[in-house]
Amino acid sequence: MISYSQIGQDIEVLKFYNNKKNGYFVEIGASDGIQLSNTYLLEKEFNWKGICVEPIPYQFKLLCKNRPNSICFDKAVYNQSNQIVIFDIANKRDLLSGISSHIDLHKKKVNSNKTQINVSTITMNDLLKQSNAPSFIDYLSIDTEGSEYEILKSIDFTKYTCGLIDVEHNYIEPKRTQIHNLLISNGYVFIRQNNFDDCYKYITNNNQQ
């Protein structure tokens, strides 16, 4: 089986769910929907459905073309909806792009050659509500180059549960510890580090498989 992910996240999801079909995903930072996608394999081969989010305009256009069966948003997921934030696009390396005020410090050199655009924000709660997402999300992937903690804070964990969460940390503190503490306090348990990602599962998610 061919992985489309950067470090095999899609294969790990399928292993975790024993090649489950018809699951539901949310991918924040979806790029063009195929290159380094954590959810394309799930949709293509296992009939998963879900939400893809990508604020960069030309990537969003490709995303809509490549993932017509997904619900696609061109917003920046954040801790408030309907705000305008400055979004840094790293020229020639747009996979390293992110919200200017949160982009990881070690990416500053990359973004010395950058383009800035204004992007409208949406919280996870509003994103899920507008998409009529189920209360149980099988897989949540967040790769936003620095704003991951703000995104997770915008989830109402009493309304939505994620069976498996992959969140990029890039070894940046205190962000990584803040993410860990937030998820642990809401019923999740750390299961593995996958290079620059941490993976968590919901404690009782076996009941949902």
Regions found by a protein language model. Name each.
Residues 1-209:
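Phosphate/nucleotide-binding beta-alpha loop and adjacent structural elements of enzyme active sites
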